[in-house]
From Swiss-Prot:
Lineage summary: Bacteria, Pseudomonadati, Pseudomonadota, Gammaproteobacteria, Alteromonadales
Keyword field: ATP-binding, Magnesium, Multifunctional enzyme, Nucleotide-binding, Nucleotidyltransferase, Transferase
Function of the protein: Involved in the regulation of glutamine synthetase GlnA, a key enzyme in the process to assimilate ammonia. When cellular nitrogen levels are high, the C-terminal adenylyl transferase (AT) inactivates GlnA by covalent transfer of an adenylyl group from ATP to specific tyrosine residue of GlnA, thus reducing its activity. Conversely, when nitrogen levels are low, the N-terminal adenylyl removase (AR) activates GlnA by removing the adenylyl group by phosphorolysis, increasing its activity.
Protein name: Bifunctional glutamine synthetase adenylyltransferase/adenylyl-removing enzyme
Cofactor(s) for this UniProt protein: Mg(2+)
Enzyme Commission numbers on file: 2.7.7.89, 2.7.7.42
GO cellular component: cytosol
Region Adenylyl transferase, annotated ranges: 458-954
Length: 954
């Protein structure tokens, strides 16, 4: 039987209350067993029940473990036995569900044992971390080996080309790799296999990579899935090549190619701790040999310091954004800083010093001391400070098996920590923790060369922000030669308004630090008062969100971008004020102005959505909106700084919309299919039988900021299947299925979340307009266009384009569109119809004062140009089918000029004027102004356009 080390320690009243509560629960399920315990055993059990809710909950579920725990030697763990014990238990598992239960029961028993030892101080921290790491490794390898046998029975054994069996190797990363795993840590893994080939001896052959990807998926499920018995470990696979967008398993050669060609600096840091799990063999040797050149350079590599600085900056930004106060891992002087210090030295000198190529943090520290890279005092301070933080972290997590590194926010958990660590009270323990973190941060700053501070000694802008008398403020501005008499009244009134707001002491302190720094930026603008107005509107929206004030306070680049973008575009200022999450985009100017490549929007969006659980519909909707807002901000930032010309701005906004349309349709499809299944004839297909047609600006690849989407939905059903049903639990007719799909798509677009509406969608261009069905069968759509549609609907069809759907539907839509546009038409009747429609639009939409010009609707404006293009296509496409190819006006004018249907000079005038007018419209949008200019500013363009319009259409 184990004996508690200090049996005279008394429990605090809070711990005693927790103990009594858990003892009462345990008595309800195991009263006879408790009565049979000795007095010493009862006292020890009561102590651990009071210290750990996790132990209490597990023992209440499995009280028979209590006798087993007392029978075991709690003061010693034979971690070498884990593998054999687990192998013996898993041998009886005949299904994955049985294996899951055995793995989880084994894990939970051992974790209770470890927590018991930790809380009663039976084990040093180093022992605990080794025990936890050994348990995790045994569980991962035990699950892998059991699953490998199951998979080989099903698919055969994976072989290389020479006929040698191929294993799945697992790299343990992070603390698992370093054998320093804490109590509730997730485990970072990378799966790999030696060589390509295929399986042999199974019911059907599989490519090796397919085999191992399936095995990897099932292995993650074995370990990570939450069942009634909990989970084994949370598994994180994001450190693999290409992260979440990469294959789950890659070959050795795939790993080598990735790290040689695309490996990033942070991945070098991650790879320092990488270790092949399980028994070591020649494959393990080969794997570590191919990774070594990427991690450890042959030369002394001081670039590691700069990489470290950047990574720490990103972590600090994340801490601020997520408001992680009291975080002993990520905060200044936290656990991560010790790891960074040691790993940076390993990366710098590991290429020359093989002894530094080790996963253990403590071992690396000792080696650095022996090599003369660390002073004894530095090693001693770092070790003792690190051990204290890791001990606190381990105990925090063992209280309730939660993955936390944040100090408690309740008195009971502080009492528990103080009891185990022999501290008098919370203040005493906090003092020790803060002292340890201060020592760590001092060594970290010495390693990375410090951090650029901004604490300027009583800068005059601090005086300006704090000054109370108007005369004093005006004198301060005059001394600095600031000639802007509107600034002080604005600043003074705003400060008075802010003073009345309830923003809390932390918010107030942060604002007082931020404002002098922000004033520095504002006073560098041509008109500080004009700059202050939009910036102050943003600040007003984040006053109660201290994390964003801190972000601006501690990031000079973000402040600079905030001021410059708000000055350049009131529209951007409004976006930042409405959606403060966009402030995160300002942190890295290089990233902000690096717009996504046109073809990369779909993959970027897929990557972004991977952060959100697939089954969390609200979070998926919010993520779509956040992605749109952040990408739109990047486009606007590049626009106002002249990085993107107008044609490319519209291209980016259009391609962004198309990527979002694809995701919205697929999400809607999944949501409807879960309830009703899919059309039976699509059960074995990845096709949807559905298409989205873009009209108007989307169709013409000419979207602007805030443009709505003109959409038409089509579907295709085989003739003999038109009335067939879906294959789900609640089957419905195919037409009804696609109607529900259309309704769900519109819901996903239009629902307002905290990040607003995704897009406003206009469906009025569908067959029969507002009175028509929400979605049309494509054959019926073709009939309508050919026989019933009005001329204005054919004009709209000129600007239509297939934007999402199956290839077969794309072909059919293109055929219908070409067939309709290429109809022979009476030109006089066509002219009359086009002119009448143009006049109707003008009568309905044109509202200008004298001397004003509406860029879209005034005579000689954008709409006149569009009508010229549409008329010329409809009038001539029957003779010149190439006119039906394009949906955008610029390329239509190009084709018309080539065919000599439009004089070259006229085509150039129309194209130039069209681009200029759209550019002005973009500019006015970014200035938060309506699309109107003084007629005098537009006269040259308008008169030229009107002359061409009249020559062609009148």
């Amino acid at each position: 039987m184990a004996v508690q080390k200090d049996s005279n320690k008394s429990l605090s009243p809070l711990i005693t209350q927790a103990s009594e509560r858990h003892w009462a629960r345990l008595t309800e399920v195991w009263s006879e067993g408790l009565a049979n315990l000795t007095a010493a055993q009862q006292q020890e059990l009561k102590t651990v029940l009071g210290l750990s809710d996790y132990i209490a909950n597990q023992l209440t579920r499995s009280p028979e473990w209590i006798n087993a725990l007392f029978a075991d030697d709690l003061q010693q763990v034979e971690r070498k036995l884990f593998d054999a014990q687990l192998r013996e238990q898993l041998a009886s598992a005949t299904t994955e569900d049985m294996a899951k239960r055995l793995l989880r029961r084994f894990r939970n028993y051992q974790m209770v044992r470890f927590a018991w030892r930790d809380f009663l101080d039976y084990a040093s921290l180093e022992e605990s971390l080794l025990d936890l790491s050994a348990l995790a490794e045994a569980l991962v390898i035990g699950a892998r080996d059991w699953l490998y046998k199951e998979m080989c029975v099903q698919y055969g054994t994976p072989m290389d080309k020479a006929g040698n069996p191929q294993p799945l190797l697992i790299l343990g990363m992070g603390k698992l790799g370093g054998r320093e795993l804490n109590f509730s840590s997730d485990i970072d893994l990378i799966f790999t296999f030696p060589e390509h080939g295929e399986t042999v001896g199974g019911r059907r052959s599989l490519d090796n990579q397919q085999f191992f990807i399936r095995m990897g998926q099932r292995l993650v499920n074995l370990l990570d899935q939450i069942t009634v018995d909990g989970f084994v470990f949370r598994v994180d696979m994001r450190l693999r090549p290409y992260g979440e967008s990469g294959p789950l398993v890659v070959s050795f050669s795939g790993l080598e190619d990735y790290y040689q060609e695309q490996g990033r600096d942070w991945e070098r840091y991650a790879m320092v701790k990488a270790r092949s799990l399980g028994p070591w063999n020649h494959f393990s040797d080969e794997l570590h040999s191919l990774l070594r050149p990427f991690v450890y350079r042959r030369y002394i590599d001081f670039s590691a310091i700069e990489s470290l600085r950047k990574m720490k900056q990103l972590i600090a930004q994340e801490v601020r954004r997520r408001q992680l106060t009291d975080n002993i891992k990520l905060g200044a002087g936290g656990i991560r800083e010790v790891e960074f210090v040691v790993q940076s030295f390993q990366l710098i000198r590991g290429g020359r010093e093989p002894s530094l190529r080790q996963q253990s943090l403590f071992g690396a520290m000792d080696t650095l001391y022996s090599l003369g890279q660390f002073e004894y005092l530095a090693v001693d301070e770092l070790k003792h400070s690190y051990l204290l933080l890791r001990r606190v972290e381990n105990l925090l997590q063992a209280i309730d098996d939660k993955q936390t590194q944040t100090l408690p926010n309740n008195a009971l958990d502080w009492a528990r920590l103080c009891y185990v660590l022999d501290m008098t009270n919370e203040i005493d323990l906090r003092t020790h923790i803060e002292a340890a973190m201060a020592k760590i941060h001092r060594h970290f700053k010495a390693t990375v060369g410090g951090e650029e501070g901004e604490e300027k000694a009583e800068h005059w802008t601090a005086q300006l922000w704090n000054v109370q008398q108007d005369d004093h403020a005006i004198n301060l501005l005059a001394e600095q030669q600031i000639d802007d008499d509107k600034l002080w009244p604005l600043l003074s009134r705003w400060r008075e308004t802010v003073t009345k707001r309830s923003i809390g002491p932390r918010g107030r302190e942060t604002l007082d630090k931020l404002m002098p720094r922000l004033l520095d930026e504002l006073l560098n603008q041509p008109s500080p008062s004009a700059a202050f107005e939009p910036v102050s509107k943003v600040l007003e929206q984040i006053l109660t969100r201290t994390t964003y004030l801190e972000l601006l306070c501690e990031n000079p680049g973000a402040r600079q971008q905030l001021v410059s973008l708000c000055c350049a575009s009131p529209w951007i200022a409004v976006q930042l004020a409405k959606f403060p999450m966009l402030l995160d985009e300002l942190i890295d100017p290089a990233h902000l102005y690096d717009t996504t490549s046109l073809d990369d929007y779909p993959s970027e969006l897929r990557q972004y959505l991977l952060r959100v659980p697939e089954d969390d519909m609200e979070q998926q909707m919010e993520a779509l909106r956040q992605f749109k807002l952040s990408q739109q901000l990047k486009i606007a930032a590049a626009d106002v700084t002249g990085v993107l010309p107008v044609m490319q701005v519209s291209d980016h906004l259009t391609f962004l919309a198309e990527a979002i349309i694809e995701q919205v349709v697929m999400q809607a499809w999944q949501q409807v299919a879960v309830r009703h299944g899919v059309p039976s004839y699509l059960a074995e297909s990845s096709d949807t039988g559905f298409a989205v047609i873009g009209y108007g600006k989307l169709g013409g690849i000419e979207l602007g900021y805030g443009s709505d989407l003109d959409l038409v939905f089509l579907y295709e059903a085989p003739e003999n299947m038109a009335n067939s049903l879906t294959n789900g639990d609640r089957p419905i007719e195919v037409g009804h299925f696609y109607l529900k799909l259309a309704q769900r798509i519109l819901h996903l677009f239009s629902t307002r979340t905290t990040s607003g509406e995704l897009y406003e969608v206009d469906m009025r261009l569908r067959p029969s307009g507002a009175s028509g069905l929400m979605v049309s069968e494509i054959a019926r759509f073709g009939e309508y266009q050919a026989q019933e549609a009005w001329t204005w609907e054919h004009q709209a069809l000129v600007r239509s384009r297939f934007v999402f759907g199956d290839n077969s539907l794309a072909v059919k839509f293109s055929q219908i569109r070409a067939c309709v546009l290429e109809q022979s038409r009476d030109k006089d009747e066509l002219k009359k119809a086009v002119r009448e429609m143009r006049q109707k639009m003008r009568d309905h939409l044109l509202k200008v004062s004298e001397g004003e010009f509406d860029l879209k609707q005034s005579p000689g404006g954008i709409t006149d140009i569009e009508f010229i293009a549409q008329y010329l296509v409809l009038a001539n496409a029957h003779e010149y089918p190439e006119l039906s190819i394009w949906s955008d006006n610029v390329r239509i004018f190009g084709v018309l000029a080539e065919l000599e249907l439009l004089p070259l000079m006229s085509a150039q005038h129309l194209t130039q004027s069209y681009c200029w007018l759209r550019d002005e419209n973009h500019r006015l949008t970014l200035q938060q102004k309506s699309g109107k200019l003084a007629y005098a500013d537009v006269a040259a363009h308008a008169e030229r356009i009107l002359a061409i319009y009249q020559a062609i259409l009148e």
